[in-house]
Amino acid sequence: MGFSGSRANTALGAWSKWLTLCLAMTQPFSVTAKSAADYYVHSLPGQPEGPLLKMHAGHIEISPETSGNLFFWHFENRHIADKPRTVVWLNGGPGCSSEDGALMEIGPYRLIDKETLNYTEGSWDEFANLLFVDQPVGTGFSYGSTEHYVHELDEMASQFVTFLEKWFEIFPHYEPDDLYFAGESYAGQYIPYIARAILDRNKKQDVLANNRVWNLKGLLIGNGWISPQHQYPAYLPYVYQEGVVQGGTQEANLIEAKAAKCMKELNVEDTTGTVHIPDCEDILQAILDYTHKGKRCINMYDIRLTDEYSACGMNWPPDLKDVQPYLRRKDVVKALHINEEKQTGWTECAGAVGSSFKARKSKPAVELLPGLLEEGLPILLFSGQKDLICNHIGTEDMIKNMKWSGGTGFELSPGVWAPRQYWTFEGEPAGIYQQARNLTYVLFYNASHMVPFDYPRRTRDMLDKFLGVDITHIGGDPADSRIDGEKGPTTSVGAHPNSTAAAEREKEKLNTAAWKAYYKSGEVALIIVSTAAVVWGIFLWRSRRKHQSSGYRSIYPMLGLNSTGSLGRFSHKHSRGNGDIEAADFDETELDGQPSQAFLSRSSGDGETYAVGEESSDEEDGASDGQQLMFDQSRGEGRS
């Protein structure tokens, strides 16, 4: 004798309630919480032959109220030296995409045409994880409400710390890494502010209590816009020194008049603490006008080159003509997990972001550097010799006048300065090193505003020295890099074996982090479903006992429940072994093993002469002739 209709309805109602409850409880995890696997890049259009590098990319929401989302592109290190390191790279502008850095400077790939990628020898991902971030909101692939674009540097830094907190929640196995920030141009304002925000965050009680301190270990800034008070006045001596402007001419007198007006503004107390001074911007515009010959003018990013007037460098570097169409391809957008509904197409520099981000209430980042250095944070500043817009004379004047740790500039003792040491790389003069009290300065000979574009191998050597990478214990072919004729720590710019011991330590760290990653990615739903199943089993058992005398054998065979139901499928997901934490979501064969010889064979771009690129196809507001060229053109404020 079976259940009566009322009892059947009661049991079915109970089952429906439990099923609804389980679905409701799992919904937030399965829909809103993303895992590292959701960001995994399975393939990259145009990728070269050989195994695909391990990458993750996509958007992370930093402000639900304003729909603020920052885009990131992460490359895992190809080899591990003595310990794991992560380098965060930022381009400047403000409003210029860090994909410039990824595809034209320090990333592992460069475009050889609009459709084909090639490996870059000297890329920075050899011994360090690379994290490229389009920030602030509105830059590159990042998006959000235009009404809430950032205006000040502390606001930008706060948003970036929020981004990192959310990023480490998704990728917890990278949180213990030694953390470095690197970038160029207007990132000379970004990076010190972000560093200050991180150090302040690390002192908070909840961070200390939860062991979430980030191991910030150093900053690298190339051709940085850091100190307007020293860098605006450097335009005139630089163009005289390089022979760009001939003194005594009517045009030169006009430039000198604008420089004098700028100096007057700099001496006004209200302007000494500002990042942007319009009257001082006129100096650069006057120089560009001076070089206007026919339809050409000097390239403000590399004075060895010319460009169409009035772009004057905006069409450079030549790779730019391929980068934009590549990043606008639908298959690339899909591969990088970009929200197509929120994007109108990648643009190198967002004019709207630059227009909003004037930092009128922010003090220049140079005022933060002494405190950072005194707290023990190593900082490296490097300059390309042939850059005009953020030239090396301005950077050197800034260092000379900066006071920290009981000294001024590179003083070793009162009146005694650290020597300028001559650097050679593979037998060629490469530049100058100078250092004291946690600050290092490197001048690259014959280099532009984008030094890694010109010399990827030399900048990688600089990076490895700064990070303290030493390949002595893991073997490899060392680079011949000498400072004042002496070799320092053994570095290698190219292929070499991995460190087995370090790899094992990294694997153990990944395994430890695996549960945390799964928990945040929605696998906690397994616990909920399991609990519901146990409760349902108890309900069945009690029902059986209650109705044994009625010949009860099963409940609703039409539901098709058996011992290998959904819980069996969840268990199968966890049977993939102890590989990568995203193993359930992609083919591990793409990642395991050492790179093939084809993968390790890449071409060098050192020493090449680059032709001026074609006219930029950016679709935002272009520059108009006349004043404030840098602030109205496609590169935002021009300091990318």
Swiss-Prot record:
Q: Which residues lie on this side of the membrane: Cytoplasmic?
A: 542-640
For region Disordered, the annotated ranges are 478-503, 590-640
| Keyword entries, A-Z | Apoptosis, Carboxypeptidase, Glycoprotein, Golgi apparatus, Hydrolase, Membrane, Protease, Signal, Transmembrane, Transmembrane helix
Name the enzyme group at the top EC level. hydrolase
Ranges of the Lumenal topological domain: 25-520
Note the SUPFAM superfamilies from the entry.
Answer: alpha/beta-Hydrolases
Spans of biased composition, class Polar residues? 489-501, 594-606
> What name has this protein been given in UniProt?
Pheromone-processing carboxypeptidase KEX1
Organism the protein comes from: Paracoccidioides lutzii (strain ATCC MYA-826 / Pb01) (Paracoccidioides brasiliensis)
Top-down, what is the taxonomic lineage of the species of origin? Eukaryota, Fungi, Dikarya, Ascomycota, Pezizomycotina
